Regions:
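Generic non-transmembrane alpha-helical segments
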Residues: 1, 179-191
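Periplasmic-binding protein-like
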Residues: 46-61, 147-184, 197-210
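Extracytoplasmic small-molecule ligand-binding "clamshell" domains
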Residues: 1-35
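Hydrophobic residues within well-ordered alpha-helices
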Residues: 19, 78, 124-125
Length: 217
């Protein structure tokens, strides 16, 4: 397709460095760091469609999770709860729940930084935190974990663009989209079914026009 690319992947480069690299061929980025730091400096290609129930193609939402014996019936009931979040620049774990809360006149506080969605679920299950927001796809993948027996879902966030594929700035999107679609066609059906990987969606730029949350230091 006329796309110059190295023979192998660089497994050592930090993802934040990779997204900003002038030779970036293809990257997958969460929409919060994309909006916060990279939107004007990359070529946006498409969003991945994981067939999230209740969300449009190419979009996703997070589910609010509390302990299974918690009396909260909705996230509003948990307004003063300690929020476990994976990363401050995670839309699913931090940005989306805080924007959902802001639309209802509050912010989740205090916080607990866990570095991973699964760690956030464990923090809630073990009582170290009171609530967390987990992207619906990850929650589905982790559905059989034993710790899931100790938590329950009490709500969901608004829909936002799913994991987004990007390349370096100034590139023609067309050959990349053709190559990505052909690569997805070559993935065995069983694997796509296991991941619920339906394909890619070209979203309008306006889909990413979402208010920025206050990012914790």
């Amino acid at each position: 397709h006329g796309i110059e690319a190295p023979e192998g992947l660089d497994h050592d480069m930090h993802h934040m460095v990779g997204w900003a690299h002038p030779d970036l061929v293809l990257g997958q980025i969460c929409n919060l760091p994309y909006r916060a730091q990279f939107r004007e400096n990359v070529t946006t290609l498409c969003a991945i469609d994981y067939e999230i129930p209740g969300s449009p193609a190419g979009f996703y939402h997070s589910v609010f999770v509390v302990r299974d014996d918690d009396p909260a019936q909705s996230p509003v009931d948990a307004a003063t709860y300690r929020l476990a979040y994976n990363e401050p620049l995670s839309n699913s774990g931090y940005g989306a729940p805080q924007l959902w809360a802001a639309s209802r006149g509050f912010q989740f506080s205090p916080f607990m930084h866990t570095h991973a969605h699964r760690n956030s679920i464990e923090a809630v299950a073990t009582g170290k935190a009171d609530i967390c927001a987990i992207d619906a796809h990850t929650f589905w993948i982790d559905r059989d974990l034993e710790l899931m027996n100790s938590v329950k879902v009490i709500g969901r966030t608004h829909d936002t663009p799913g994991m987004t594929l990007i390349t370096r700035a100034g590139q023609d999107r067309a050959p990349y989209l053709v190559a990505i679609r052909q690569a997805l066609e070559a993935v065995p059906t069983a694997i796509k079914s296991e991941l619920r990987l339906r394909g890619i969606v070209e979203l309008p730029a306006s889909a990413y026009d979402i208010p920025m949350p206050n990012i914790p230091a």
